[in-house]
Design a protein with these regions (language model features):
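Transmembrane alpha-helix segments characteristic
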Residues: 19, 36, 58-62, 144-150, ...
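Perimembrane helix-loop-helix junctions
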Residues: 4-10, 32-68
Length: 334
């Protein structure tokens, strides 16, 4: 028994390390999922204080790295670098979590923020938009990806403890994210809800079981509904996924591959390349080597005000060339 308890403790500690790492990379996600997992470890089946302590210890070991990072970047272990940056460029508290009149970007940030500040009405509207996107993006079914989840709530009999745990996880993710001002439903769908992906897939499977049980018994009784499911899955795999991955965001935001192709062809050598404003300059900037390797070019935006003498002094031995990609947008959305 002691050996088994020790093995379980090591696994819980490892799980804590993983959730602490999530907290390090995406703090809010780590708090949500790590906190819910901690409650399950403490109060769920076979839960105990000892198990929760092993899990919490792992969380602290890796999660504390975020506090050290914050301290190095902002001077305070509790102040995030992103919040510090946006406080300086937007307004103090602009990236805060919750409701308030000064939360969010100035000037609506290209119409991505509906109203100044963030309040319950905007949170409700964001949630509605994200749900509408989820019914298409979750499974890639144009007939509605949430249908199986509806079936779970309507017809699933003998709901299990784990079923309700998954409902709680999904609901918590949706509720907590409503308090953040940026929903991003306009660009990439409900990506801030991705923590709810597994619970939603699980509930969809349970909903399909419930739907299947409602069909009459007998030989071949489930052929039709199984065929519908298979056809819908094939549509999601063979039609929706290629479109979503390769077509929907092709040259979206005026990003294009002209600079990448020219770089691959050896056009630039190790020159300092002043690119004309043609599409999104980030298409070129993303190709910059962060260490300014001697055999790689350096891309800069040609603003007409750059001090070329200073550039030559900073990067001796590099030619300065101007490059116009000659690219034109094919999608009016940009």
């Amino acid at each position: 028994r002691a050996e088994g308890a020790g093995r379980a403790g090591r696994r819980l500690f490892a799980a804590g390390l993983a959730f602490g790492w999530i907290f390090l990379t995406r703090p809010l996600d780590g708090l949500i999922l790590g906190g819910l997992t901690g409650i399950w470890v403490l109060a769920g089946p076979r839960g105990s204080v000892a198990r929760a302590a092993a899990y919490a210890a792992g969380c602290v070991v890796t999660g504390a790295l975020l506090l050290l990072h914050n301290l190095a970047m902002t001077g305070s272990p509790l102040r995030m670098a992103l919040s510090d940056y946006l406080d300086g460029h937007w307004a103090p508290g602009a990236n805060a979590f919750g409701f308030g009149p000064d939360i969010g970007p100035p000037g609506r940030w290209g119409a991505l923020d509906l109203w100044p500040g963030h309040g319950p009405a905007e949170a409700a509207l964001n949630t509605i938009n994200l749900t509408a996107s989820l019914q298409f993006d979750l499974l890639g079914w144009s007939v509605g990806s949430l249908a199986l989840i509806y079936a779970f709530f309507l017809w699933a009999r003998g709901k299990r403890v784990f079923d309700w745990a998954m409902v709680a996880v999904a609901a918590t993710v949706i509720l907590v994210m409503a308090f953040y001002w940026f929903a991003d439903s306009y660009y990439f769908g409900p990506r801030y809800w991705f923590l709810a992906a597994f619970p939603l897939f699980y509930l969809s499977a349970r909903g399909y079981d419930a739907l299947r049980a409602r069909f009459p018994a007998g030989e071949g009784a489930h052929v039709r509904i199984d065929s519908i499911l298979a056809l819908s899955c094939l549509f999601g795999l063979l039609v929706f996924t290629p479109w979503r991955g390769a077509m929907k965001y092709f040259e979206y935001g005026n990003f294009h591959t002209s600079y990448r192709r020219a770089l691959a062809a050896g056009t630039f050598g190790n020159a300092i390349v002043l690119v004309a404003k043609n599409g999104e300059p980030g298409s070129a900037f993303m190709l910059n080597d962060p260490w300014f390797a001697a055999d790689r070019p350096i891309f800069l935006l040609d603003t007409g005000t750059l001090d070329e003498a200073a550039l030559k002094a900073a990067f001796p031995g590099r030619a300065i060339v101007r490059f116009d990609a000659g690219w034109q947008a094919r999608d009016a959305r940009g």
